[in-house]
Swiss-Prot record:
Listed InterPro entries: AAA+_ATPase, P-loop_NTPase, Signal_recog_part_SRP54_M_sf, Signal_recog_particl_SRP54_hlx, Signal_recog_particle_SRP54_M, SRP/SRP_N, SRP54, SRP54_GTPase_dom
Recorded family membership: Belongs to the GTP-binding SRP family. SRP54 subfamily.
GO biological process, one term: SRP-dependent cotranslational protein targeting to membrane
GO cellular component: signal recognition particle
Protein name in the entry: Signal recognition particle 54 kDa protein
Keywords noted in UniProt: Cytoplasm, GTP-binding, Hydrolase, Nucleotide-binding, Ribonucleoprotein, RNA-binding, Signal recognition particle
Subunit details: Part of the signal recognition particle protein translocation system, which is composed of SRP and FtsY. Archaeal SRP consists of a 7S RNA molecule of 300 nucleotides and two protein subunits: SRP54 and SRP19.
Function: Involved in targeting and insertion of nascent membrane proteins into the cytoplasmic membrane. Binds to the hydrophobic signal sequence of the ribosome-nascent chain (RNC) as it emerges from the ribosomes. The SRP-RNC complex is then targeted to the cytoplasmic membrane where it interacts with the SRP receptor FtsY.
Domain comment as written in the entry: Composed of three domains: the N-terminal N domain, which is responsible for interactions with the ribosome, the central G domain, which binds GTP, and the C-terminal M domain, which binds the RNA and the signal sequence of the RNC.
Catalytic activity: GTP + H2O = GDP + phosphate + H(+)
HAMAP family according to UniProt: SRP54
Gene: srp54
Binding, GTP: 105-112, 185-189, 243-246
Superkingdom of the organism of origin: Archaea
Length: 431
């Protein structure tokens, strides 16, 4: 079960309450505790969280016009933000050249894939990045990172038959001395964990990295604190990256546990694709978990792909025709899985788009391009003129069935609804 699923039932229950007295408050407090424990948040943090939230609900008066149940959701939101790391979104700003980043983590944490994700993230923002593999224990690590580096177009340094991880790291940094950022991947857990920690400490002393990232698998939940503290005994941990946040309810526990250690969660991995990686923003993350949507993130994604001002204006104004849709078919692929885009929408809208429709839209972009290319300009600008005979003609020209054309039009209608929702939400935010 995902973290958002754990909390969606809780939010439904809160919004189903007509009024909040002490008995209702106590019942909701227990529900909140159960939800947090399901998310694998440490027990002492659960107690502190509920005590603080209940105290605020008892003592604070909702602003005029805000129903108590909505204010309760707001308090829950605010307290979750505090629990998971505070107000400020994370930043990554290299301060020198090359800026050396050292990645640490136990075996299976997703560290090597994360090295490539971080490299892709930085390369997309204009940084020249080099990847260095120092794992001499796991032979596949060299090939894995080399292949990922080639896939994302980033230079790679490693020594397939190398025996000394420290020397490989030093040579790698020297090899990439003209890069903006050098990312060093290290070995995961050895049979002897103490040997692993000694090795990463030796690499740290040799290359003197500017930032040390600990990579933690979200599925470990509250045990994330123990992992962080074990590494902290040997060397400073400046930042944390939590992977697999899309696939487990324990992600909240991992975030809370890390925040408790004083380490800063800087990035989260939200899927398997190399593009599914983002700076951690506690407010945006909690908004998604509570089903409030994250329209800022949606707009940011749209801007990154739809660079043309006209297209963006059409999306924001709620206008979207098939001509715009046709121009952006190729760009849609750059968004990554469309399921991620729909997850950024408020839950009361996103749930209306089925997984089957999203999967269909991901698989059939090329087919749709052929369909759209078979339409006249009138049909592209005015989809309402499409009748059965026109659809048959379009299908024949595109080499598909009329059913394929209708399925594409269904997805297009969902896109139109999304743009209208975006427009309404933006108006609300401007008030």
């Amino acid at each position: 079960m995902k973290l958002s699923e754990v909390f969606s039932k809780l939010i439904e229950k809160i919004r189903g309450v007509d009024y909040i007295d002490e008995a209702v408050l106590q019942e909701l407090s227990r529900e909140i505790q159960r939800s947090l424990l399901k998310a694998d948040v440490p027990l002492e943090l659960v107690k502190a969280f509920t005590d603080s939230a209940v105290k605020r609900i008892r003592e604070e008066k909702p602003p005029a016009g805000i129903p108590p149940r909505e204010y309760l959701v707001y308090v829950l939101y605010e307290e979750l933000v505090k629990l998971l790391g505070g107000e400020q979104p994370a930043e990554f700003k290299p301060t020198k050249k090359p800026y050396v980043v050292l990645l640490l983590g136990v075996e299976g944490s997703g560290k090597t894939t994360t090295a490539a994700k971080l490299a892709k993230y930085l390369a997309k923002r204009g940084y020249k990045v080099g990847l260095v593999e120092t794992d001499t224990i796991r032979p596949a690590a060299f090939d894995q990172l080399k292949q990922l580096a080639e896939k994302i177009g980033v230079p790679f340094y490693g020594e397939r038959d190398g025996k000394n991880a420290v020397e490989i790291a030093v040579r790698g940094v020297q090899n990439f001395k003209n890069m903006d950022v050098v990312i060093i991947d290290t070995a995961g857990r050895h049979r002897n964990e103490e040997e692993l920690l000694k090795e990463v400490k030796a690499i740290y002393d040799a290359v003197k990295p500017d930032e040390v990232f600990l990579v933690i698998d979200a599925t470990v939940g509250k045990l994330a604190a123990a992992q962080a503290e074990a590494f902290m005994k040997y060397l400073p941990i400046h930042s944390v990256i939590i992977t697999k946040m899309d696939s487990t309810a324990r992600g909240g526990g991992a975030l809370a546990a890390v925040a408790k250690t004083g380490a800063r969660v800087k990035f989260i991995g939200v899927g398997e694709d190399v593009d599914e990686f983002e700076l951690f923003n506690p407010r945006k993350f909690v908004a998604r978990v509570l089903g409030m949507g994250d329209l800022d993130a949606l707009v940011e994604k749209i801007k990154a792909v739809f660079e043309e001002d006209k297209v963006l204006e059409e999306l924001e104004s709620g206008r979207l025709d098939l001509l715009t849709f046709k121009k952006q078919i190729d760009s849609l692929l750059k968004l990554g899985p469309l399921s991620k885009v729909f997850q950024l929408l408020p839950s009361n809208f996103a749930i209306k788009v089925s997984e089957e429709q999203i999967e269909l839209s991901q698989k059939n972009l090329r087919k749709w391009k052929a369909i759209l290319s078979s339409m006249t300009m009138e049909e592209l600008k005015h989809p309402e003129v499409l009748n059965a005979s026109r659809i048959r003609r379009i299908a024949m020209g595109a080499g598909v069935t009329p059913k394929d054309v209708k399925e594409m039009l269904t997805v297009f209608e969902n896109m139109k609804k999304m743009s209208k929702m975006l427009k309404r939400q933006m108006r609300m935010k401007m008030r």
